[in-house]
Amino acid sequence: YIDAVPYRKNLSVRRLYSQYDFARKAEKILEKEQADMVYMILPANSLAAAGDRLKRKMNRTVLVFDILDLWPESLGGKKLQKLWPFQYWRRLRDDHLKAADLVITECHYFQKFINAKQEKTAVVYWPKEVPEGWKMEIPENEAPENQVPVPEPQTALGNAGVNTPAVIHFAYLGSINNIIDIDGIVNFLEITGKMTSVFLHVVGDGENRGLFEEKLKSRGIKAEFYGAVYEEAVKAEIFSRCMFGINMMKPGVCVGLTMKSIDYFCYGLPLVNNIPGDTWELVKQEQIGINYRPDAALKCAQELLELAQSDRLKEIKYKMQSLYMKLFAQEAAENVIRERVLPLLEGGPK
């Protein structure tokens, strides 16, 4: 283990120093190793600089960068991105990507923001293991395929028919931090709530929880906050009450896929989405929810209501779970590693 400098705030000088210190210590340890491959997960961006130096010192070592998040781009704020400290922070990553034999990104969308040759890039979506004890609900007109976890009691989706549900239950999963679009979520729920009753189930916690609760209450939106939930069975039971999963972040945040959306895919919750790139295209092409636009909020709410009234929800649930198995299950990630990473060990660095 490497001792790391502790920090409290998500965005702070102390956190940046902690990451710099970790990269420095990791580099010193790796200098003493005879490694066939160095696989570095970014951020911290300072690891990219360390990897570049190690690559030059360890000539025959294969270097792989795996970019799980773009910092500082994912923090949002166009004005912030132009400030010198943020430009320097970004260049800590970008100026050293050329040293890698392969650059893996968490989604295709990230590749628009990095300077890496296409033939030296690959996409590995963040995998989620199939939870034990759940199976895919197969529509009557579909042939059975791989087993996918869904709660057997379909209290929300299974009973959805051609009539408007008395209450539309939404799920929000994940951190309640400074980059989620609290105003967008609240506005959308308020508009939808004028057409039918709505209820929000919040699975997660964070520094903006109080603000989220206050804004929901001020608009008369009923909600229940469960805090952070780590038990898969508990999370599945909460999701079984919900009809849609909310996947919304502030405009300008550089994210193409969220971990919460992978859970929604796993449990077959159609998306209320404003995330660009990979997720936006999946929703659009596969018709697995609605892509929310603030300038067309009323139209989006009407589209959601039409979907809630339709008989397509079981079909969408099945489609989302099939996409989960194809794109986001552990096996999908392992296939990319076998096809793109392991051959580098056999042939050595390019």
Regions found by a protein language model. Give the residues of each.
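Nucleotide-activated donor-binding/catalytic signature segment of Leloir-type glycosyltransferases, i.e.
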Residues: 201, 210-236
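Membrane-proximal helix-turn-helix segments that form the acceptor-binding/catalytic region
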Residues: 24-27, 46-49, 53-57, 83-103
